[in-house]
A protein has these predicted regions:
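Glycine- and aromatic-enriched membrane insertion/assembly motifs of diderm outer-membrane
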Residues: 43-100
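Flexible, solvent-exposed coil segments and beta strand-coil junctions
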Residues: 64-69, 103-108, 168-173
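Outer-membrane beta-barrel transmembrane domain signature
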Residues: 1-51, 109-184, 193-197
């Protein structure tokens, strides 16, 4: 489940764009092919009591050693609001012949807040995976390009960010902590991941 936590600032197009584009941690180093991820990302806003949520559960599948697909369809109701998120993307792994530790990804997310607005988002990322003992670390850069349509006018923009994450094996699943940030926003993500052969 992916959740963006906030109020007025969280409802801005740039903030929503960054909140709904959480990356799927499909590990390029191990050989497992199917991934299921449940995550919660949020932005902390001191002094605010109102929260807006954006849930998501998604999957990833390695088509080959250096190519993976990701996607999800999630509908969620909160009070009198009903929201739908549809996402799909591709990840390409590259690096040395024996270790594909670099990842470039392209993802499109369509967020529909019924009776309020639609937001279409394209995310481009470049990241590096590093293994230390049993843990994995990932860092990279990315950009979101969004279009918000509130049925009266359209608003376009771009959000650039830095990505840092840690993936820790716990029993039969993995726990991930991720940060996406720029000079204006700071998002946290907590994820549970399960991979299969």
């Amino acid at each position: 489940m992916q959740i963006l936590n906030g109020s007025n600032e969280a409802k801005s197009p740039s903030s929503i764009s960054l909140g709904i584009s959480n990356s799927y941690a499909i590990n390029p180093i191990n050989t497992n092919r199917l991934y299921i991820q449940s995550s919660m990302s949020f932005k902390s806003l001191p002094g605010r009591n109102n929260y807006q949520y954006y849930p998501d559960i998604g999957f990833g599948y390695k088509v080959s050693k250096n190519l993976a697909l990701e996607g999800s369809v999630f509908n969620h109701s909160f009070g009198s609001f009903s929201d739908q998120t549809i996402r799909g993307g591709v990840q390409y792994y590259f690096g040395s012949s024996d270790t594909l530790s670099w990842v470039s990804s392209l993802k499109k997310v369509s967020y529909k807040s019924v009776k309020n607005f639609n937001l279409n988002n394209i995310t481009i990322e470049l990241s590096k995976w590093i293994k230390y003992r049993q843990n994995f670390f990932r860092f990279g850069l990315g950009s979101n390009f969004y279009t918000k349509d509130n049925f009266l006018f359209k608003q376009k923009g771009q959000v650039n960010f830095i990505l840092l994450s840690t993936i820790i094996p716990v029993s039969f699943f993995q726990l991930s902590f991720e940060t996406r940030m720029n000079l204006d926003m700071f998002f946290y993500s907590f994820s549970l991941l399960k991979d299969f052969h």
